[in-house]
């Protein structure tokens, strides 16, 4: 089994930080985390008993009735520890209120499916349940499907987490290893450098994982035979299907089957028109895949990968999980050689007379790497 890598990050500072959060304060936080940093390996190796009895459930902190649905396969090899400033609290009542505010921010401002982390540790020394052990968080793009995301919150501005919080995080990490949620083998921890860094990045690096793809056999594809694709493709075309969308895996599998039937039975195509489809559940569904031509964009189908978001996105864009999944798929395609290194990313409307992918989605992809109007 691959070793897991512990990554300290300051992601989340962008959302809740302020201009007074400077390098000196970040350094103070970094120094305060060194105790945790230096003792995690000793804790897990000694197998010390842990106490997570102070975990506050979602119900107890008043979580909004939303939720992410993408399963996380455990044990994972990576643990990402975040620090979320700007939510000072020192008792369960206030920390629960701050966590509700954070969840609302992630859902309503960031278009997330829930609070971004698997678990959070308040400055009151309690562990707060996020999305839990078995669901992917949306905390670190490119790593959500291979990592657990833990976060400190409630810390007074410019201060490191309290001794109670550090102890709670130690116990949480040790518990994760002992219960099989986190791999027991690991390398020397890495301090990840974010927008506002906690410590300098060391030489060790971690490659992003290619996202998991729901294969045709799982969503119930009809057997077909279509022209082969010559790779690498020169274009990535972003599309929307129009019509209804889906938010949970069962709905998305049904929708993909319906789209395939529409292409085959109504449009007389040899198969579903896209190489891959992205659901609002944050999952990627295999269309015709990497090696077969799609049929959504005549004149480009033999030189382009068609990636479609299921739904209509003229006014409201896809949620954060769906957008991240698509970006990870594109990055994976380039790394694996399915896209040329100098590929061009375009909207469907750039190469065909159509409103797809919708203005709201188009506005977002126009900021992505390799975009060409």
Curated annotation (Swiss-Prot):
According to the UniProt record, where is the region Interaction with murein?
293-302, 353-354
Q: Which GO terms describe its biological process?
A: antimicrobial humoral immune response mediated by antimicrobial peptide; defense response to bacterium; defense response to Gram-positive bacterium; detection of bacterium; immune response; innate immune response; killing of cells of another organism; peptidoglycan catabolic process
Q: Which residues form the signal peptide?
A: 1-17
Q: Name one GO cellular component term.
A: membrane
Going by the UniProt record, its keywords in alphabetical order are: Antibiotic, Antimicrobial, Disulfide bond, Glycoprotein, Immunity, Innate immunity, Repeat, Secreted, Signal
* Tissues in which the UniProt entry reports expression: Detected in skin epidermis, eccrine sweat glands and ducts, mucous cells in the submandibular salivary gland, mucous cells in the throat, ciliary body epithelial cells of the eye, small intestine, colon, stomach and in mature epithelial cells of the tongue (at protein level). High expression in skin and esophagus. Expressed also to a much lesser extent in the tonsils and thymus.
Could you describe the post-translational modifications of this protein?
N-glycosylated.
For this protein, the record's CDD domains field holds: PGRP (cd06583)
Which residue range or ranges hold the N-acetylmuramoyl-L-alanine amidase domain? 74-212, 235-358
Keyword Disulfide bond attributed: yes
Where do the annotations place peptidoglycan binding? 263, 274
Q: Does the keyword Signal apply?
A: yes
Outline the subunit composition.
Homodimer; disulfide-linked. Heterodimer with PGLYRP3; disulfide-linked.
**Family to which this protein belongs:** Belongs to the N-acetylmuramoyl-L-alanine amidase 2 family.
Protein name per its UniProtKB record? Peptidoglycan recognition protein 4
Q: What is the lineage of its organism?
A: Eukaryota, Metazoa, Chordata, Craniata, Vertebrata
């Amino acid at each position: 089994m691959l070793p897991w890598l512990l990554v300290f990050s300051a992601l989340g500072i962008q959302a809740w930080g302020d201009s007074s959060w400077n390098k000196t304060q970040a350094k103070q936080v970094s120094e305060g985390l060194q105790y945790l940093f230096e003792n995690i390996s000793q804790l897990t190796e000694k197998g010390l008993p842990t106490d997570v009895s102070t975990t506050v459930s979602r119900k107890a902190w008043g979580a909004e009735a939303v939720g992410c649905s993408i399963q996380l396969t455990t044990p994972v090899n990576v643990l990402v520890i975040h620090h979320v400033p700007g939510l000072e609290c020192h008792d369960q009542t206030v920390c629960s209120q701050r966590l509700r505010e954070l969840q609302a921010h992630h859902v309503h401002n960031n278009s997330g499916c829930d609070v971004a982390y698997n678990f959070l540790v308040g400055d009151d020394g309690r562990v707060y349940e996020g999305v839990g052990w078995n669901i992917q968080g949306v905390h670190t793009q490119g790593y959500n499907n291979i990592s657990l995301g833990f976060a400190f919150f409630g810390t007074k501005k410019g201060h490191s987490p309290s001794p109670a919080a550090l102890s709670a995080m130690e116990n949480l990490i040790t518990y994760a290893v002992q219960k099989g949620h986190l791999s027991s083998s690991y390398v020397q921890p890495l301090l990840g450098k974010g927008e506002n860094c906690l410590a300098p990045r060391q030489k060790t690096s971690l490659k992003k994982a290619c996202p998991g793809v729901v294969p045709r056999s799982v969503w119930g594809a009809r057997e077909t035979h279509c022209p082969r694709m010559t790779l690498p493709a020169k274009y990535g075309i972003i599309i929307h299907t129009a019509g209804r969308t889906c938010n949970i895996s069962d709905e998305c599998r049904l929708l993909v089957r319906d789209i395939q039937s529409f292409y085959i039975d109504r449009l007389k195509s040899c198969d579903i028109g896209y190489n891959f489809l992205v659901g609002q559940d944050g999952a990627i569904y295999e269309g015709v895949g990497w090696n077969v031509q799609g049929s959504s964009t005549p004149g480009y189908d033999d030189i382009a990968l068609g990636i479609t978001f299921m739904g209509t996105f003229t006014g409201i864009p896809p949620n954060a999980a769906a957008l991240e999944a698509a970006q990870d798929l594109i990055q994976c395609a380039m790394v694996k050689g399915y896209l040329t290194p100098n590929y061009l990313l375009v909207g469907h409307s750039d190469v065909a007379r159509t409103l797809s992918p919708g203005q709201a989605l188009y506005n977002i992809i126009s900021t992505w790497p390799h975009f060409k109007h």
